[in-house]
Amino acid sequence: MSPRPEPRALTAEEENYAASLWEIHREVTPSAVAMSFAGIVYETETHDSRQLEQKIEPIARFFGNAERRVGGLAVPASLSKAHGQYLEAMALYRKASDEMLAFTKDGGRQHLIDAQGMGLNASEDILRAGEVLWPGQYKPH
């Protein structure tokens, strides 16, 4: 099996975009993990929907803001696909957190199931975009 080819170096414009996105990204990963853990703790330990709501509300606000921040970045044409993947991930994380909050209101378990699927898809989108923007980055998923 031949070694994987080295990714091409980013242009100055691409590097500026990647650095701007990194400022958002470094908050995305812990927020996504916190959202997952809040759901796990609810399911396995507390079954306290009020506590779940208190944990998810700030995460939902973060993802709404992150989606707007990512959407507002100036994107080089060469990175439009990666940008689209990342922006879709932010939308999915926002929708997932909204689903979890909906669960705290009506108790409909389908909200949690849907949120889990959205979170997984968002994580995959971020990994794909990250391969282009930050090749070689440690991926804990």
Question: What are the language-model segments listed below?
Answer:
Residues M1-P5:
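Amphipathic, hydrophobic N-terminal targeting peptides for secretion and organelle import
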Residues E6-Q85, A89, S97, T104, ...:
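Alpha-helical segments in soluble extracytoplasmic regions
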